[in-house]
């Protein structure tokens, strides 16, 4: 209830988020559970993978357009978020390669943001997640993508 009410009052672009599908790449169960709950209350569907390799594999195997965006943790086992992003950006299917990817990480310094952008990510959100910032970032990235 709080998330829905907050979205309506804040004008963060809830209409643009409703019904979207996001692939969540997060190895920490608690972080994933919190993020999924926030997104679900905002009308966003999520599917979760637990490492960078699973994320790349999921994007490769699913049809382009299955997901509107990826929320990508940086520090994950097997393949970190930067390497997973770079692998996705190199995919031969350009519709899959250009999916918006947002870093979602405890690394909140300016250099971390620059590294995320340099890896090919479209944005950066710091943990712990702040509702306003997350929803605003998602709406902004979706708007930018629709204007491509």
Language-model region placement:
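C-terminal compact regulatory domains
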Residues: 1-148
